[in-house]
């Protein structure tokens, strides 16, 4: 009896070729395809996997789990790698790995294969996650082993009658889920080349966006968006709704050269319409609901959390601890944020919360001012005391020092 290997199957170029490659190596292939909100026709993927001679194909709808257990932390933690990338692909990898391990254990498979290259981050994310969840499972990386160029891989697919929606004129590598869309390869590898419009799918070009703005009110409950204009949504449905609305206005396009975990720089084109709107609104709500010390310290945790995710360390003691901290900060992050969507911009122009720490009577400069300005003299004396003592000892500060 042949040994079984579970393959993370997307129906795309890499994993379609990988099925044939693993069969040639003498394994039975158990294909596994997860829906994490990318809108793919899974019936076609299922049929394609079996047509490629996989012995089984498991289709798993994990969209809600993805939104509730993973995207929720991206929102509460304002997670952005290098202050630019909302972790679109990185966020889904631990969940995909978790489901692959479950299928491998259920089918008595000896290992798990993925379609990642040897130059990318995903190979690390998948294999480290698999080791964390079940160290006895082997990891297989067909694309890394065969080391073909993109063009050679396309030629192999054509030669073996493997149907793939890719050609030499448009050789993009695309990954999409509920939280956004990532695109690389082809002309995008030149960091000076402007991305052609066919590189985008979720967002309109600015020239094609409406000339009238949409203004929405996004309601949060403990850091999670729950309503748009008073209508309640499950998180996954809310994100899909915002993707369509914000994408119509050209919001969420990101052109970023990032520092990969494996040591190289990579130019990526991301589309994350809902993510841009939600994160801007969430940050705005935090400005009135977090204390100063938490507001100043939380970005340090956010940066570390984003790097943990980007580097494939979701299943780790540190990430568990970071999640606990993030959760503890969100108890009072509830309220409404008003956002204007127009010509590629998501503009926050109002926020309110029943837990607001903003006191208008203290902030105002009108006659209703409740701030005791006389107290400022004593505060300045105490606050400036170390500076005063230093100046008295050393004769005052000068530019020469």
UniProtKB/Swiss-Prot annotation:
Annotated L-aspartate binding sites: 117, 121-122
Gene Ontology terms, MF aspect: argininosuccinate synthase activity; ATP binding
Broad EC category: ligase
Signal sequence, start to end: none
PROSITE patterns named in the record: ARGININOSUCCIN_SYN_1, ARGININOSUCCIN_SYN_2
Pathway(s) it belongs to: Amino-acid biosynthesis; L-arginine biosynthesis; L-arginine from L-ornithine and carbamoyl phosphate: step 2/3
InterPro entries recorded: Arginosuc_syn_C, Arginosuc_syn_N, Arginosuc_synth, Arginosuc_synth_CS, Arginosuc_synth_type_1_subfam, AS_cat/multimer_dom_body, Rossmann-like_a/b/a_fold
EC number: 6.3.4.5
GO cellular component, one term: cytoplasm
Keywords: Amino-acid biosynthesis, Arginine biosynthesis, ATP-binding, Cytoplasm, Ligase, Nucleotide-binding
Pfam families (UniProt xref): Arginosuc_syn_C, Arginosuc_synth
Matches recorded under NCBIfam families: argG, PRK00509.1
Cross-referenced PANTHER family: ARGININOSUCCINATE SYNTHASE (PTHR11587:SF2)
Subunit relationships: Homotetramer.
Protein name: Argininosuccinate synthase
Native species: Staphylococcus aureus (strain MRSA252)
């Amino acid at each position: 009896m042949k040994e079984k290997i579970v393959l993370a199957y997307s129906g795309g170029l890499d994993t379609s070729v990988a099925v044939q490659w693993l069969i040639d190596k003498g394994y039975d292939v158990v294909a596994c395809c997860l829906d994490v909100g990318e809108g793919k026709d899974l019936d076609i993927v299922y049929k394609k996997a079996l047509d490629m001679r996989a012995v089984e194909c498991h289709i798993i709808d994990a969209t809600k789990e993805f939104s509730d257990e993973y995207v929720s932390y991206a929102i509460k933690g304002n997670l952005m790698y290098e202050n630019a990338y909302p972790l679109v692909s990185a966020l889904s990898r631990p969940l995909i790995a978790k489901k692959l391990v479950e299928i491998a254990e259920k089918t008595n498979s000896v290992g798990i294969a993925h379609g990642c290259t040897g130059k990318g981050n995903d190979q690390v994310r998948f294999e480290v996650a698999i080791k964390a969840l079940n160290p006895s499972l082997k990891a297989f990386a067909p694309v890394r082993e065969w080391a073909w160029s993109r063009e050679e891989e396309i030629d192999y697919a054509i030669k073996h009658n493997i149907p793939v929606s890719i050609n030499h004129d448009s050789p993009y590598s695309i990954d999409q889920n509920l939280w956004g869309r990532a695109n690389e390869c082809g002309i995008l590898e030149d960091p000076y080349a402007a991305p052609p419009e066919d590189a985008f799918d979720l967002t309109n070009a600015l020239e094609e966006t409406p000339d009238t703005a949409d203004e929405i009110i996004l309601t949060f409950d403990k850091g999670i968006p729950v309503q748009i204009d008073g209508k309640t949504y499950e998180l996954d449905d809310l994100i899909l709704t915002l993707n369509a609305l914000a994408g119509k206005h050209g919001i969420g396009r990101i052109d970023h050269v990032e520092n990969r975990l494996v040591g190289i720089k990579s130019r990526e084109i991301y589309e994350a319409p809902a993510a841009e709107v939600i994160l801007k609104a969430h940050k705005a709500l935090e400005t009135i609901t977090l204390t100063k010390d938490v507001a100043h310290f939380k970005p340090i945790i956010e940066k570390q959390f984003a790097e943990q995710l980007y580097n494939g360390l979701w299943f780790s003691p540190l990430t568990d601890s970071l999640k606990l901290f993030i959760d503890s900060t969100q108890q009072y992050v509830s309220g409404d944020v008003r956002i204007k969507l127009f010509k590629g911009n998501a503009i926050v122009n109002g926020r309110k919360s029943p837990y607001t720490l903003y006191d208008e009577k203290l902030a105002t400069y009108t006659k209703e001012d409740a701030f005791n300005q006389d107290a400022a003299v004593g505060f300045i004396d105490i606050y400036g005391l170390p500076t005063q003592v230093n100046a008295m000892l050393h004769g005052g500060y000068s530019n020469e020092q």
